[in-house]
Amino acid sequence: MSHATGSRAAGATTACKVIVGMSGGVDSSVTALTLLEQGYAVEGLFMKNWDEDDGTEYCTAKEDLADAQAVCDTLGITLHTANFAAEYWDNVFEHFLAEYKAGRTPNPDILCNREIKFKVFLEYAEMLGAEKIATGHYVRQGWRDGHCRLLKGLDANKDQSYFLHAVPEVAIARTLFPVGEMEKSEVRAIAERHGLTTARKKDSTGICFIGERRFSDFLKQYLPAQPGVIETPEGEVIGEHMGLMYYTLGQRQGLGIGGLPNHPDAPWYVAAKDLERNVLIAVQGKHHPLLYTDSLSTEPVEWVAGQPPAPEARLQAKTRYRQQDVACHVRVLEDGGVEARFDEPQRAVTPGQSLVLYDGDICLGGGVIRSTWNHSEPRGDSAA
């Protein structure tokens, strides 16, 4: 499952052994470098989580592996490789497809972190004799009352705690996050100063197994599209959609609506999905009231510390990555989920995405958004 190349760092027999998840990017490169400088016995591991065999240019695994190997050679450390594609398919990708089939918009990166990077990778690193693992995520650790807390990264623009909220405390405690204490510009400067080949490499974006290809082209390989009509909230048919799974709430691009009689010349936005009728509901105007909601409920919450801070609490929350924290009142439900009521209505809150809860810089955990409503009108279960 793994092969090793390179040589171990000097003094590794007595120092704490750490295996760094090497992605071939600048963040994991500087993570390995920093830990070496701090005296750890560092080795790297490159994970292949997706088997790309269609001969396209979309999968960058070979290029990323080459970059990871080049960095490890420069640092003089071992690079292991491991193929976790089967585990990824079973524990992440099948859930991804099931959610889209059900009309929701999932976030596979969150599940990948919980199931692969901080579970399968951690277990594999233990097999290799590691005491800890490390990743290039922009988050920090903190300890309070004997518990390891997940904290936001120092660089607010790069903070990735949203994606790590479902990782349990025991895994957070076993992981080092050196770049979480740095600004992104500092990370690149360190890599440049030490001659690392990844210093100017572009950050990866989007879902790893889709790459730069069109999302609809990828998804239709696995799920048959079911075209239908686009309606206004009043029931007027104004267009056709390619399949509900290709659209998300608040979306403007790709609707193909324009020049309609008796309607102003203003952009249209996805407001809801009627799953039973296979109808997409669209409204005009970026700030149309139907695009906003002030309340939601979630599936059972993954609390980093294993339990909620209180049955009810005033907290801050994000409903999407890079959103500014918003104030809300949270109540824990009997099934382990939460009900959140925002101080101000939020735009395009999407079932299938995650509500992540914070107490200042502490990421408490989060859960998948199940339903949303505004005032007394639920709309999340049947109109995702």
From Swiss-Prot:
ATP binds at G21, M22, S23, G24, G25, V26, D27, S28, M47, G136. InterPro entries: MnmA-like, MnmA-like_C, MnmA-like_central, MnmA-like_central_sf, Rossmann-like_a/b/a_fold. The keyword NADP does not apply. The active site is at C112, C208. It catalyses: S-sulfanyl-L-cysteinyl-[protein] + uridine(34) in tRNA + AH2 + ATP = 2-thiouridine(34) in tRNA + L-cysteinyl-[protein] + A + AMP + diphosphate + H(+). The record marks H137, Q353 as: Interaction with tRNA. GO terms for molecular function: ATP binding; tRNA binding; tRNA-uridine 2-sulfurtransferase activity. It is an enzyme of class 2 (transferase). Its EC number is 2.8.1.13. Pfam families: tRNA_Me_trans, tRNA_Me_trans_C, tRNA_Me_trans_M. It comes from the Bacteria. It is found in: Cytoplasm. Residues 107-109 are annotated as: Interaction with target base in tRNA. Keywords: ATP-binding, Cytoplasm, Disulfide bond, Nucleotide-binding, RNA-binding, Transferase, tRNA processing, tRNA-binding. The keyword Lyase does not apply. One of its GO terms (cellular component) is cytoplasm. Disulfide bonds join C112-C208. Residues 158-160, 320-321 are annotated as: Interaction with tRNA. Catalyzes the 2-thiolation of uridine at the wobble position (U34) of tRNA, leading to the formation of s(2)U34. HAMAP family: tRNA_thiouridyl_MnmA. This is tRNA-specific 2-thiouridylase MnmA.
